[in-house]
Regions:
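Phosphate/nucleotide-binding beta-alpha loop and adjacent structural elements of enzyme active sites
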Residues: 1-239
């Protein structure tokens, strides 16, 4: 996870900005696009005093194996070889040779090259609503979505959960090089009445990639935390 985004999430946690779980439910964090599981471990350790579970999803077989090994000795961390989408139980495909490459950039490129959205390796998709439906007794308090282009689909599969739990969300988009996808993600967040704050920090490739933190517009405390963070960042940059 990028430095500034991590600092902002730690500030939100330190200032008690995450929603409290609903009565008789377990508070949860979703790390979707978990890669090798290192960010999921960081989240578990940072959130330990809140007794939150971290559910890490990673579609690539090799990455999921590494993440699963990392999780063996970490309490409250659960790893699944799954992708996120808008239809629970659907199947996605990719060339098997991607499992021989550590970098997730190949999946990111594949989102925009139709010929790479097929292959002899596959993974199942689930939805946020399926993972956090009422029968699970879970409350989603934070979702970190690093889905290499799949953020919009994940948000479309989260309507009930976003309405019920109002979690903090982080998403990654490319406002210039992948403008249509960026606008779609922003429109979905607006439809759920989320205010979006953009972290001025380059992520991934192409170089216009940015992280965004979205918080429920009605949550004044969260908005104050983020307004303060970005005001301080601007003051530090001023000559």
């Amino acid at each position: 996870m990028e430095y500034k985004l991590w600092a902002l999430l730690l500030l939100i946690v330190d200032r008690d900005g995450l929603r409290k779980p609903r009565p008789n439910t377990q508070g949860c964090v979703l790390d979707a696009g978990a890669h090798d599981g290192s960010t999921a471990v960081m989240l578990v350790n940072a959130l330990r005093r809140l007794d939150l579970q971290v559910h890490a999803l990673e579609p690539l077989a090799r990455n999921a194996e590494v993440a699963t090994r990392r999780a063996r000795d970490v309490s409250n961390l659960y790893v699944y070889r799954l992708g996120l989408g808008e239809v629970d139980g659907a199947t996605a495909h990719y060339p098997a040779e991607y499992d021989g490459r550590k970098s997730s950039i190949h999946l990111q490129i594949a989102r925009f090259r139709e010929q790479d959205n097929a292959g002899n390796a596959s993974y199942l998709l689930t939805t946020i609503d399926a993972m956090f439906n009422d029968d699970t007794d879970r409350t989603l308090v934070l979702a970190h979505l690093d889905l290499e282009g799949g953020e919009a689909a994940a948000l479309r599969g989260a309507n009930r959960t976003l309405k019920r739990d109002r979690p903090v969300l982080t998403v990654e988009t490319f406002p210039q090089s992948m403008a249509k996808w960026h606008r779609e993600v922003m429109a979905l967040l607006e439809a759920h009445d989320y205010q979006v704050f953009t972290v001025d920090e380059k992520v991934g490739w192409p170089p216009d990639g940015r992280n965004h933190v979205a918080v429920p517009r009605e949550d004044r405390h969260l908005r104050y935390i983020l307004d303060s963070f970005f005001a301080f960042s601007l003051r530090r940059r001023a000559p």
